[in-house]
Amino acid sequence: RYGVDACPHSWHNILMGLANGHAVAALPNGRVLELCMIQGPLQWDMLAERPPTEDGHLIIGKRAGLAAELAQDVEGRFPYIDGGYALTVQR
């Protein structure tokens, strides 16, 4: 409407990245999706398979929903931790 491109930042896990990727693909002004590549194991290891990419582009799957399947025992490998999950760096 205003000629501004949409460029969401997906700074958490790959499920959020896939959801944002679908949004960017559906938007007429969707330009790019930025993913945090240093998130840690939760970023990719929560899925049974990594989503396909080609030349740095996320390939949106054709299956229903987010076109992804959770890995086995995700809740066992990544249990809920009460409180914050940030690390404090002492200088």
Name each model-derived stretch.
Residues 1-65, 69:
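Shared catalytic-loop signature of beta/alpha-barrel
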Residues 65-91:
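Extended hydrophobic packing segments that form well-structured cores
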